[in-house]
C-alpha cells in the first residue's frame, strides 16, 4: 500500500514564488507521467525527507492533486551543494500494473579475504538500472564480496537474480575488484658527481 504524501499544487512557477516556498521550508517540484500532465507542486521538505527515510528511495507514494489520486515515485531530485538542502523534486506518476525503470544502489556485503590480505577494494558501479512494477522495485541490490581474493572481479553477471525485477545492464561490466597493493618504491639516492679539476694556463702575476 502506497504511503500518503501531502503535496500542494502551485498556481505559478515564477522565481519569486519558488524563492518564497523554499524560505518556508517547502520544496518546489513537478508531477508528470501516467495520466498526468506536467503539474507544478510543492511539498514540505521535512515531510518528504521523513517519508523517504521511512519507506525508501524507491517507495510508491500516494498524492492528491486537483481531487485526483496518483501513485508517484521520487524520480529525480536536486540538492543545493552548499546548503545541503533539497531544492527541487520530480515525481513520476505510475501505473501500478506497468513496469518502470529506475536506478537502484548496489550495496557490497561481506568481508573480502583479499582486502584482509592487503588488497585494495574498488567499487566501479554504484547504481544499476532496474525494471519492475512499482511495488516490486528494490531499495538496494546486495552483492556478496566474501569470496573475493586479490585479483578477483565481480561483474554485472554476478548480481543476484530476482523474479520481481530485471537488472538492465551490459553483461560482464565490472562492478567491484580487489587489486594488489601498490609496492612501495625504495627511495633512491644519487651521488653528486665529483667536481672536475680545471686546468688552465698559469697566469703571470700582475704588477
Curated annotation (Swiss-Prot):
Molecular function terms in GO for this entry?
5S rRNA binding; structural constituent of ribosome
Alphabetic keyword roster: Ribonucleoprotein, Ribosomal protein, RNA-binding, rRNA-binding
Pfam families (alphabetical): Ribosomal_L25p, Ribosomal_TL5_C
Amino acid composition bias (Basic and acidic residues), ranges on this chain: 196-207
Quaternary assembly: Part of the 50S ribosomal subunit; part of the 5S rRNA/L5/L18/L25 subcomplex. Contacts the 5S rRNA. Binds to the 5S rRNA independently of L5 and L18.
Function summary: This is one of the proteins that binds to the 5S RNA in the ribosome where it forms part of the central protuberance.
UniProt name for this protein: Large ribosomal subunit protein bL25
> What organism, scientifically named, is this protein from?
Listeria monocytogenes serovar 1/2a (strain ATCC BAA-679 / EGD-e)
Amino acid at each position: 500500500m502506497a504511503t500518503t504524501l501531502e503535496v500542494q499544487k502551485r498556481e505559478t512557477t515564477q522565481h519569486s514564488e519558488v524563492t518564497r516556498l523554499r524560505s518556508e521550508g517547502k520544496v518546489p517540484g513537478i508531477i508528470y507521467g501516467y495520466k498526468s500532465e506536467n503539474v507544478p507542486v510543492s511539498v514540505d521538505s521535512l515531510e518528504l525527507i521523513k517519508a523517504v527515510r521511512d519507506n525508501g528511495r524507491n517507495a510508491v507514494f500516494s498524492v492528491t492533486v486537483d481531487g485526483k489520486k496518483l501513485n508517484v515515485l521520487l524520480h529525480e531530485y536536486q540538492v543545493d551543494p552548499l546548503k545541503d538542502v533539497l531544492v527541487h523534486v520530480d515525481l513520476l506518476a505510475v501505473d501500478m500494473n506497468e513496469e518502470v525503470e529506475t536506478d537502484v544502489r548496489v550495496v557490497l556485503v561481506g568481508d573480502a579475504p583479499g582486502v584482509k590480505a592487503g588488497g585494495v577494494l574498488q567499487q566501479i558501479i554504484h547504481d544499476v538500472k532496474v525494471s519492475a512494477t512499482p511495488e516490486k522495485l528494490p531499495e538496494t541490490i546486495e552483492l556478496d564480496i566474501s569470496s573475493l581474493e586479490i585479483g578477483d572481479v565481480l561483474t554485472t553477471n554476478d548480481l543476484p537474480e530476482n523474479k520481481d525485477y530485471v537488472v538492465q545492464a551490459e553483461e560482464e561490466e565490472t562492478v567491484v575488484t580487489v587489486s594488489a597493493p601498490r609496492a612501495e618504491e625504495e627511495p633512491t639516492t644519487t651521488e653528486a658527481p665529483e667536481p672536475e679539476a680545471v686546468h688552465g694556463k698559469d697566469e703571470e702575476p700582475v704588477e
